[in-house]
């Protein structure tokens, strides 16, 4: 989410290449996230207290730092953010740098350059969190992993770095294998039902079923804001039931739901519930599988080695998109 802020608009079969990349990606994700369920904190704030609480929470496994992007598109290391990220790494957290892809408003070569610049400014970061991507343009994002086209893959230029893609919406099956993490739901709590309705439309299930498979769980992220304070346990449970392994739940609201951590009393409730899943005290629920049509083998998009990651010719019938609002944040 570009929050500083916004509400974002909001592949069952992969190719041999994508499967190979996906296998490596899954290994990285599982190695980094040893807990069955954990928290990723979008640390789009400056105050030391919020950073300290996030860093010292055992079930927080990922922290996303949000640097300012200068007008020339080049990241310049901020002393304060560099120090916070170093403290997080010292506590065993996986640190990611926020980079926006700007939907179709930013050229893909510029996005690739921003990623390079982010790693130049923050070389010790473990990866990038790429926001504002399109749910249906796999051909663009394939270049991140496979290095096809005119842009060399990020994997080749930055080996060992993680990639998390964030459309904040359901992603087509052709994305499978292109990243280490997929944030497939990011919205207000009251709007989650619309997401559920979308992925369960009969015409959509072949495209979205991959996100609900048990073996993909370590790579599925979800973030839900505007949650009533008394319902944070329920919001955690619901995210886990949707196959999310990495999550963030907050009662904070737009225009910037990530400008602070929840108050201690609420944060502790969230931590306690996640901890119950992480330790196995509460077993992971059986994910409610999508209703796959009997002819799924023929209706599911299949990619060949020549078309891996290419946007599908037939798209889901009612993909939900979210509007974007932006605010300015000082660092």
Residue ranges and their predicted role:
Residues 1-31:
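Secretory targeting and sorting signals
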Residues 22-34, 307-313, 320, 328:
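C-terminal region of N-terminal signal peptides and the immediate post-cleavage residues
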Residues 32-294:
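Glycan-processing catalytic domains of CAZymes
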Residues 97, 304-308:
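Fibrous stalk/shaft segments of extracellular and virion attachment machinery
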Residues 295-296, 306:
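N-terminal propeptides/leader regions of secreted preproproteins
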């Amino acid at each position: 989410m570009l929050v500083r802020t916004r509400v974002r608009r909001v592949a069952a079969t992969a190719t041999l290449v994508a499967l190979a990349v996906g296998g490596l990606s899954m290994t990285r994700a599982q190695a980094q996230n040893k807990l069955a369920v954990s928290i990723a904190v979008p640390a789009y704030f400056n105050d030391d207290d919020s950073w300290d609480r996030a860093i010292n929470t055992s079930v927080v496994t990922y922290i996303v730092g949000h640097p300012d992007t200068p007008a020339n598109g080049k990241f310049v290391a901020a002393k304060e953010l560099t120090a916070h990220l170093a403290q997080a790494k010292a506590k065993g957290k996986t640190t990611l740098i926020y980079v926006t892809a700007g939907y179709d408003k930013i050229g893909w070569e510029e996005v690739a350059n921003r990623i390079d610049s982010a790693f130049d400014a923050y070389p010790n970061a473990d990866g990038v969190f790429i926001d504002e991507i399109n749910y249906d343009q796999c051909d663009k994002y394939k270049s991140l992993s496979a290095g096809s086209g005119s842009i060399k893959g990020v994997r080749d230029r930055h080996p060992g770095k993680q990639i998390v893609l964030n459309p904040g919406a359901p992603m087509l099956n052709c994305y499978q294998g292109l990243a280490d993490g997929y944030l497939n739901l990011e919205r207000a709590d009251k709007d989650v039902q619309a997401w559920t309705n979308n992925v369960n439309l009969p015409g959509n299930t072949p495209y979205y079923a991959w996100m609900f498979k048990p073996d993909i769980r370590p790579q599925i992220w979800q973030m839900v804001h505007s949650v009533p304070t008394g319902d944070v346990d329920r919001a955690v449970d619901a995210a886990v039931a949707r196959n999310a392994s990495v999550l963030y739940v907050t009662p904070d609201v737009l225009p910037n739901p990530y400008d602070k951590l929840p108050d201690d009393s609420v944060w502790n409730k969230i931590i306690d519930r996640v901890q119950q899943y992480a330790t196995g005290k509460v077993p992971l629920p059986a994910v409610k599988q999508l209703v796959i049509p009997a002819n799924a083998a023929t209706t599911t998009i299949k990619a060949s080695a020549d078309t891996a990651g290419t946007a599908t010719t037939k798209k889901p019938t009612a993909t939900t998109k979210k509007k974007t609002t932006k605010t300015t944040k000082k660092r």
